Amino acid sequence: MEKDKLQMIADHYGIKKQLRQLAEECSELAVEASHSARKGLTIGIIEEIADVEIMIEQVKYLGRISEDDIQEVKEAKMERQLERMKEENNG
C-alpha cells in the first residue's frame, strides 16, 4: 500500500521535480540535525528523516535504483571507514 502511494506521487511529479524536492528535504534535515546536536533530539528530527526517506524511495523508484546496488556501495563505504578508524587507532 505505502509503495503504491509513493509510486503514484513519484509518477505524478517526475524525476527532476523529485530530485529538487529531495535536495530541499536533505537541507531541512541538515538544519534539524545541527539544531539537535546543540539542543538534543526532538520530534523534528524524526519528521525530517521521514521526509528524506520518502523522497529517497521515490528517486530510487524513478531512477530504477535497486536495493542491491545501494547495499553494495554501503558495504564498501563502511569497510573503507572501518579501515580509516583502524589507521587512526594505530597512528
Where do the language-model regions lie?
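Flexible "arm" and connector segments at domain edges
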Residues: 1-91
